[in-house]
């Protein structure tokens, strides 16, 4: 079980040594592994290297490749920036130990087999049975038992190290060194499968290097040193493939070498050394020879000879002779038709694939075109290779390419091949059999030109290379490949040349000259033809001399007969010739005209196609330019993004999140992250911290809730005590306050009376009156002029506003325009009437008001609370009422009369005084014309029914329905009480008294139903908070009295949680009724009082 606590590296190493000393190597390995894998190690020390060396020893001894891989990857992350030499030391030590263990296992396996072989007694029955079943030797079985596990471990070690070091520039040399050791391992132990996998891994690593060239730490393909290392490694890979005779893998390795050479050549042509090319062509020639491709084998040797000659400044004669002889023999060994597609390729109709393969192989040889046998021979002749080669090779070249002696050719070639064999050169002897086949093919082709039929025995004498069966198989093969057209006749024991049937002839034939090969042989054939022609001419001359007379007589008769025939047909022939000439001329004219028309059409079609091609080319170039521009912009954007990401990552390294990520995941994980990933990691960490903080807060909140609840319980006791104390002291405070208020009111009244008396004296003074009159007269003209100007400007602005509003609004009908005009005229008329009414009210205002004698008229619990003057609610729209309020405020306060200075009714109208004698003061102003008259009229009607708050009483009919019976019973009314209409009563009724009416508005009907009064508390009550006074209906800071709780407004509907101002009417007998409130609202209001006791 690995420890779950952190250990220092020195402690872990000491602990591992202790465990090893007691034989617990696995526990020691786990201890060291946990120490290396710990994320708390951020700085490399020398102790870490000692831990890794011991860790590698334990992994090798216990055969734990996966643990070694994990530890090496972690150690690479720890050391790749500071101690890369330490990483190399650990890896080399690890591979050395694995190799030693493998070699020891191999020796152990061999020794065990030798011990078994040395025993005198017979084999055990199980060994005999196993050998009979498997067919393997004892050494093979022992290797599988003892050596195979260590071979597998060593292979895993090489592969893991290569994966660890791939695509990293700082350990590139170590990577290639391990790759070459891997090739040696595969060659030494003949691990063919592992060699293929190793080659595939190296190709995959190269692909990844090409893909990630934009990164900073990767291997750069622009580096000369890197390309040289890769090229040398690929050449060793090719050598190993040839050594292990894996020819398919050798061909793929040759492609890899060619690709690396092309990369090096693109970087610098001088980077690839000529010796590398010589080695490359030598190995490639061997691969082609093993593949049976003699044409490209000879081409590779020729390329090697050319480069070798240019490379060697002092090209010795022996080296030149050796290279030239090999090239010459390889070229002569090329069979006829080697550059043509095979029969299978022709039958499957895949000639294009054959051409593509030829082009690919030519690219491997760095040839612009595919090589041919004739082209190679011309190049050999140009380089004068036959003269440089050995004598036997030069003779073979002359016999095969220059002479025409099919009957003697085989014996001559056999003699020269014997000389070549006597040279005892393996690279020469490999061409002997191929040269025999080429010689036999050439003899058969030459014989087929001269003879039609030849006996099989004669052919066996001419071609001594094969016996009967081999010769017959050879003839069938060359006939199948259509080198010659031959048919074997076993009955007659002969061979017939030439196709017996046209259907048996192939769809193509080689040229006749292909049977002879060179120009010298063609000259020999011409000599034979000239000899036969001269013999024919001589024989013909001898016949003419012997039969001269007979020939002369026959010639004379023929001449006479031809003359007669000519004379007979002369005229007809002449006419026929003339007619034919005319036809020919007509045909020529017609054909020329048609040819001209066709030429013109062809020219027009060519011009059209050329124009179309140019247009397509222009479109293609434009598209390419667009794509290139798009790619350029994309590359620029990617570069900008990369720089921005790099800058962000650089800034992030200065933040605490960098330390947190490195602490948790390591430096390598941070290097592989982008800014978005870092921000996402930071956001996740913040979310985690927020969740932890929220959990702690929730835990504290639970504790805090209990504490607050305890506070509240104690607070309730303290508040009850304060409330009881306040209830005891409230009457005393009220009496003292009332006493001070009465005294202050008396003093204010006395001062006001004194002022009034002084003003009366001034008013009665004739000098003052004369002065006021003179000032009025002096300013009368200016005053009247300003009044008239103001009126004119007002009318003009009003008309302009009406016209402007008319144009802005959608055009309505003519009736609406007329209605607007009428509203303007009506508004003007109302203004005039308002001025007249104001003058009348000023003249009819009483001198003083009656003073309330005592406070017993107020039935409210507040004692001496003053009733306020009722206000008549207007049914006009809100906009008009707002304008009226502005005008009313601008008009100024009314001068207080003597009656206004009383202590109880100052500024108010008493409820007990009837108002029949004096008209109600109306503060209404004429309405301002509105653009939405209909809508505001509806709103005004709604206001007239809901604007009963703030100490106002709504005008309602006396006949409207009253509250229901259960509501009366709930409020303490008798269950059988009858509802009656309210009568005009000047004094308060008994129903108005009682503590349950606290803060409610009381409305009583007067003689006129439009005049009502409302009770209110005094304006000044310092011992009550303003909030409670406002809630109970008392005026605050001059505001009208009324029951207005929090949340209610003057224009809101009369339903809701806080609208508890109710209208109550009663008669003289104490019958009580409630209007406009439901039972549910009463219950909810009572509950609100109970719930909000702390607010009050």
Swiss-Prot record:
The keyword Coiled coil applies. Pfam families: eIF3a_PCI_TPR-like, PCI. Residues 808-852, 878-890, 933-942, 955-973, 1085-1096 have a biased composition (Basic and acidic residues). Keywords: Coiled coil, Cytoplasm, Initiation factor, Protein biosynthesis, RNA-binding. PROSITE patterns: PCI. GO terms for biological process: formation of cytoplasmic translation initiation complex; translation reinitiation. GO terms for cellular component: eukaryotic 43S preinitiation complex; eukaryotic 48S preinitiation complex; eukaryotic translation initiation factor 3 complex, eIF3e; eukaryotic translation initiation factor 3 complex, eIF3m; multi-eIF complex. InterPro entries: EIF3A, eIF3a_PCI_TPR-like, PCI_dom. Its main location: cytoplasm. Residues 865-875, 1008-1023 have a biased composition (Polar residues). Residues 808-1096 are annotated as: Disordered. Residues 591-643, 677-761, 811-839 form a coiled coil. It is found in: Cytoplasm. GO terms for molecular function: mRNA binding; translation initiation factor activity. The keyword Transport does not apply. Residues 323-502 form the PCI domain. Component of the eukaryotic translation initiation factor 3 (eIF-3) complex. HAMAP family: eIF3a. Belongs to the eIF-3 subunit A family. RNA-binding component of the eukaryotic translation initiation factor 3 (eIF-3) complex, which is involved in protein synthesis of a specialized repertoire of mRNAs and, together with other initiation factors, stimulates binding of mRNA and methionyl-tRNAi to the 40S ribosome. The eIF-3 complex specifically targets and initiates translation of a subset of mRNAs involved in cell proliferation. This is Eukaryotic translation initiation factor 3 subunit A. It comes from Brugia malayi. The lineage of its organism: Eukaryota, Metazoa, Ecdysozoa, Nematoda, Chromadorea.
